[in-house]
Amino acid sequence: MFQMAKRAFLSTTLTLGLLAGSALPFLPASAAYADPDIAVTNKQSFSTDVIYQVFTDRFLDGNPSNNPTGAAYDATCSNLKLYCGGDWQGLINKINDNYFSDLGVTALWISQPVENIFATINYSGVTNTAYHGYWARDFKKTNPYFGTMADFQNLITTAHAKGIKIIIDFAPNHTSPAMETDTSFAENGKLYDNGTLVGGYTNDTNGYFHHNGGSDFSSLENGIYKNLYDLADFNHNNATIDKYFKDAIKLWLDMGVDGIRVDAVKHIALGWQKSWMSSIYVHKPVFTFGEWFLGSAASDADNTDFANKSGMSLLDFRFNSAVRNVFRDNTSNMYALDSMINSTATDYNQVNDQVTFIDNHDMDRFKTSAVNNRRLEQALAFTLTSRGVPAIYYGTEQYLTGNGDPDNRAKMPSFSKSTTAFNVISKLAPLRKSNPAIAYGSTQQRWINNDVYVYERKFGKSVAVVAVNRNLSTPANITGLSTSLPTGSYTDVLGGVLNGNNITSSNGSVNSFTLAAGATAVWQYTAAETTPTIGHVGPVMGKPGNVVTIDGRGFGSTKGTVYFGTTAVTGAAITSWEDTQIKVTIPSVAAGNYAVKVAANGVNSNAYNHFTILTGDQVTVRFVINNASTTLGQNIYLTGNVAELGNWSTGSTAIGPAFNQVIHQYPTWYYDVSVPAGKELEFKFFKKNGSTITWEGGSNHKFTTPASGTATVTVNWQ
């Protein structure tokens, strides 16, 4: 009962403060009144967080004694291909002086912390270094130019004390640049295990790497099984490599990291990544999101499939492209922005878990000399109040510019807290913790034309309404605006920083008003929930016996019931129950997709759909079929007797289409699949052309999977 009263008091206090026009203070997650769903200890959900992506080397040099020497280092940071000296101590210093807390960010996404190559590489007469962190050599040691293991632990401890989570970049796709015929080039892609050499790219007799040439990106298969540029590409079907990465990530999880950003997931087999994610969720589950680069706003079926089946979220490139087109490049309008919001909500099972952003280290920065500051500020406001987990690239708050690599990775120019962009972020970021409509809510368009977008976020009784006019010279008359805001007057959360105004709502309608040219305004209302309402379940995949976290509002203080489908979980299987968070053990039920519900005080919550229960621990198996000839339009698919193989379905849960170009060539087909460990599988292949299915004949193929590691099973078409 105390928990419910505390929530009601906090909600009422924050709402009244906003209606009075006062600024919302930053509420550190370690504060005594913080609820568990918004706390720094919640590693399974980042719905209430704002991420700040920092290139460690480019932020701040806090310890000059660990800087490189010689040709790898430029103290002036004028040569952006060399190390500039930024390190974890620099991040610690800015955590301690409250730069991040004052900005309102509650998670730092740092460069990959592992040991990178020490060699410099000459490309076209230009010396290159591994300052970016993506040329790894040992995934179980730190990059000494960033700091020691003790420094890294200090970074995590310091961040947590300030209510800030730490996300590490992690790149299991490759080591470093290598040439098959020249072992002296760079470090030959060598991989080390805590200082012990595992192997190099040349004379790779153990098959640790792929040797299929460089990718031309012409197909998904080509991108997975060929090298990304000249980077030594791992063969994850190798049992040694599989174990190496499952062990390596546990080392960083045991250090206390709160999240993982996985590099180049488009270039690693889904079957291995799902197995890897399962091992993470068994060990220490944390929020994980991957980089699947999309070059345009167009949807990609493989991208969507990965987001819905891999067990991790993605960086939302569709969001990024739409925002840049509308606010930066002026090549699209608000209808396209609204269309993106609607289409991604349909395509992604957990759209609120996708990580939204306006720029990063792999594209031109949002800000250029030709882009008005107000457009950047509006893009930030839109991102911070939209669905998804917002990520802000370092220096954006200082209007840092730069087109392409390496200019988009320049040194942090200043740490001013007085810029308008800093002010916008600092005012809007805390809403993710104070108003569940921003963290968990649905999105509904309320008023729109080419230049104006008014949208509403809603979760239970809590509401936020956002209005943006991108036209920098013409105000907009807003009439007939409907809203879920209760009757009353509402001040702009931004306090007029972006020329927003106050509004009055009466019986679901907002009085007509003028939205100034270039204005953005945010109005919000929060209220305590008296009925259970689920906002997030994380992770979204697990085996029976794993513990998952349910976040939301109105669960009460007395244990109720959690349902996975129709299976009720009660008693000791619910390890904790608070008004905003429940921790529950996955029951022993048949594997498959389930809707999760909560029942409290005789009332059922909304359904949180698409939770995946696995059969058990996972291993990766490569399924190969010979002599499978097809006609034009046909592809080969796989199905079998477990949920991971589609439970004999020929629909969307079947595996495929299989590949036939790189590892094996037509009429041999193959596919890497995450399947239950130590289990006898029965399976068959089939040909599919639209709705026409042609099964292979004979009895079911059978194969018993290993208890760990990887395997390959090869059969002939029957």
Swiss-Prot record:
PROSITE patterns: CBM20, TAT. Residues 35-172 are annotated as: A1. Residues 529-614 are annotated as: D. Ca(2+) 2 binds at N173, I224, D233, H267. GO terms for molecular function: alpha-amylase activity; cyclomaltodextrin glucanotransferase activity; metal ion binding; starch binding. The record marks D362 as: Transition state stabilizer. One of its GO terms (biological process) is carbohydrate metabolic process. It catalyses: Cyclizes part of a (1->4)-alpha-D-glucan chain by formation of a (1->4)-alpha-D-glucosidic bond. Residues 173-236 are annotated as: B. Substrate binds at Y134, W135, H174, N227, L228, Y229, D230, R261, K266, H267, H361, D405, R409. Monomer. This is Cyclomaltodextrin glucanotransferase. It comes from Bacillus sp. (strain 6.6.3).
